[in-house]
Amino acid sequence: GAVQASANTGYLANAASSVNITLPTVPQIGDWVKVTGLGSGGWNILQNAGQRIGVSGLPGGLAVNWAASPIVGSWTGLASSSAGDRLVAVSASGELYTSANAGGNWSPRLIGQTWSSVASSSDGLKILAAVNGGSLYWSPDGGNSWLNDGTGRAWTAVASSADGNRLVATAYLGQIWTSSDGGLSWTARESNRAWRAVASSSDGRVLVAVTNGAQLYVSTDYGVSWTARANGQFWWSAAVSADGKTMFATVDTGAIWASTDFGTTWEPRTTNRDWRGVATSADGRWVVAATSGGTLSQSTDGGNTWRATADTGAWTAVASTADGSRYIAGKSGAAVYTGQRVLYTTTGATGGVSGGQNDALQLQYVGGGVFMPISYVSANLQFGVR
């Protein structure tokens, strides 16, 4: 059946087939509509022209839509500005690309180096990139001009503070190197280890560096001193929240491990897989991790629960905006993908939300064509979002 909803009215969908309920055509701010599924057919909320529904707080409403970019490479490192407008992608096959419009267009910058990692400041203008067996390269202007340090180390990973001044780089079977002046000078830290990856808090004070086959190490003094944490694993990648309190680290043929106490204690949060890159929002709530030969996985609750996103492939690296609404992810030998988190239904008559038997949803009109959920019961794990 089909019903045109009236404002401030509740509806019981009691049929063997889905009941279509269209939102009020001229709602006033504060008006509400409630739908409860009694029958086995469930319900389907339809929208009018110019209307949409906020779904960020609904089960099933936090999916990420992925789209392939035209650039192809063996992607080893990705970086995103806080807003997601400026992106950097580096490949072991020799490419370094930048984008200034959220991946709409890509510009080749430095070609022919075996790139291993890249990091950027929060505005995306200051870029630090590493070459495995070569130098560290940095750009102050979004990739238009570059300097390098002239070294020839087995650089594996780099990380940057939000302002781009405090930098850290790891060398495989070498040391950890830190800079407090945007890369002009570097100081060797810690011992020679099989360093695999490194991540930084926004101020550069809290750092985590992971090793291939041994423990991971945490610093809370800008990299001056390091403390061994967790246990020996084949660690692959790491990510840190802006304040440094929440950390994630992936293990090759292991789990994703998490810490919520500045890296002091760690616990596994996932099943064992061939985990690769991991990225987190600034607050540590939104997390995306890559697997080699599987899908990307995402968490919307700080790593407590995970579900698949994107398709299957040899995913390698991933980066996130500060708010966790947009992502960039790379497949080895394939494309770079941009991801957009679904925060609203599609505007207009093609969008809407559906539920099943025993599902209930109450929406309130907040203006501008937007209805927001104020209560729900999700008996079927998640709602359908269009």
Residue ranges and their predicted role:
Residues 1-60, 368-386:
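Exposed extracellular interaction/assembly regions and N-terminal maturation sites
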Residues 342-386:
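Extracellular jelly-roll beta-sandwich "head" domains, especially the C-terminal globular C1q domain
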Residues 93-96, 133-135, 173-175, 213-215, ...:
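Loop/turn residues immediately N-terminal
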Residues 80-81, 98-100, 121, 139-140, ...:
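Conserved Ser/Thr-centered positions that define the repeating blades of beta-propeller domains
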Residues 316-341:
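Blade-level signature of beta-propeller repeat domains, shared across WD40, Kelch, NHL, RCC1
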